[in-house]
Amino acid sequence: MIYFDNAATTMRKPDCVIDAVADAMRNFGNSGRGAHEASLDASRMIYETRERISELFNLGNPLQVAFTSNSTESLNMAIQGLFSKGDHVITTVLEHNSV
């Protein structure tokens, strides 16, 4: 599992991130929810991002890349997928609140 979360500990986003988010909000629709151009563009961008992440981490299959809405959801998915009731897990005070 690879976990990326710096939103809780960093300052404001760089201008390039702000610009990219604004562009996506202007030009993309709900992926997978329609056959209109904005929806198809969003679906393509998401799949291209999956491909790039898959290549970066040598996963082999872009569909192995999962996106979630936030850190808590990601951690819950990983924890519930890895551990069963009764398992013993040791953490530190540095872990995310959901852990």
Report each predicted region and the residues it spans.
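Pyridoxal 5′-phosphate
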Residues: 1-99
